[in-house]
C-alpha cells in the first residue's frame, strides 16, 4: 500500500538542497478530515474538510476535499513549523457560484493570522495576501505599486499546481510551473504552520501537498 508520506530530495529556491515531504492522503480513511490536521475556517460559516476518493486524483485514490461554505475555509497541518522553505499543492476547482479558489497558507500562527497565495477559476487570477486578525489584504508585487495579483487562466475542472517559496521577507509564487511574481512583506517573520485554503462556496480538491524547509 502506498504511503501518504513520500520523502524526496529536491532543490529549492536560491541555492542548496532541502528534504521535502509529500502527503497524498491515499492511506487515510475517507469521509472525514485527515488526522493531524486542524480542519477549520477564518470567519463565519461552516467549512467541511474530508478525505475522499476521486478518480481524477494525481495520486490515486484519495484527495482532500473542501465542500462546505465559510468565509475562508482552512486546513492546517499541525506538526509543521517552517520559517524559510516552500509549500506546494495540486488543486482542482470543481464548483462554486461565488468563488472557485484554491490556495496554500504558510507562517500560520492560527486560523486568523497567516500568509496566503491563491488561484481563482472564476476571476482567472493569482494573488498573494496576508490575513491579520481575520482580515485579508492583498500585497503589492515587487516592482509594481498597486494592482491585484496577476491575470492567469485557471481552468475549472482541471488540476493545477500552486507553489510558494519563502525566505525572510521575500516570497516567490509559481503557478503550473511558471514563476508569476515575487512579494516582500514583514508582517509574519517567525516560523509557523502550513496548510491549504479555499473561499466561500468553493468546492475544491487537493492532492500531493508538498513542503520543505530551507
Give the location of each predicted region.
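Short, solvent-exposed beta-strand-to-loop segments that form ligand-recognition rims
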Residues: 169-195
Amino acid at each position: 500500500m502506498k504511503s501518504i508520506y513520500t520523502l524526496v530530495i529536491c532543490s529549492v529556491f536560491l541555492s542548496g538542497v532541502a528534504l521535502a515531504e509529500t502527503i497524498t492522503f491515499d492511506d487515510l480513511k475517507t469521509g472525514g478530515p485527515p488526522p493531524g490536521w486542524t480542519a477549520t475556517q477564518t470567519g463565519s460559516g461552516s467549512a467541511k474538510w474530508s478525505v475522499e476518493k476521486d478518480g481524477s486524483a494525481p495520486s490515486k485514490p484519495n484527495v482532500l476535499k473542501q465542500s462546505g461554505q465559510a468565509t475562508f475555509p482552512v486546513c492546517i497541518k499541525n506538526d509543521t513549523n517552517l520559517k524559510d522553505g516552500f509549500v506546494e499543492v495540486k488543486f482542482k476547482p470543481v464548483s462554486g457560484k461565488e468563488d472557485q479558489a484554491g490556495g496554500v497558507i504558510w507562517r500560520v500562527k492560527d486560523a486568523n493570522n497567516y500568509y496566503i497565495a491563491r488561484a481563482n477559476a472564476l476571476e482567472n487570477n493569482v494573488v498573494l495576501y496576508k490575513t491579520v486578525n481575520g482580515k485579508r489584504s492583498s500585497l503589492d508585487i515587487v516592482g509594481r505599486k498597486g494592482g491585484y495579483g496577476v491575470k492567469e487562466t485557471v481552468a475549472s475542472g482541471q488540476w493545477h499546481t500552486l507553489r510558494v517559496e519563502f525566505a525572510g521577507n521575500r516570497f516567490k509564487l509559481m503557478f503550473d510551473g511558471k514563476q508569476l511574481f515575487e512579494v516582500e512583506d514583514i508582517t509574519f517573520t517567525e516560523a509557523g504552520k502550513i496548510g491549504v485554503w479555499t473561499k466561500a462556496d468553493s468546492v475544491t480538491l487537493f492532492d500531493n501537498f508538498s513542503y520543505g524547509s530551507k
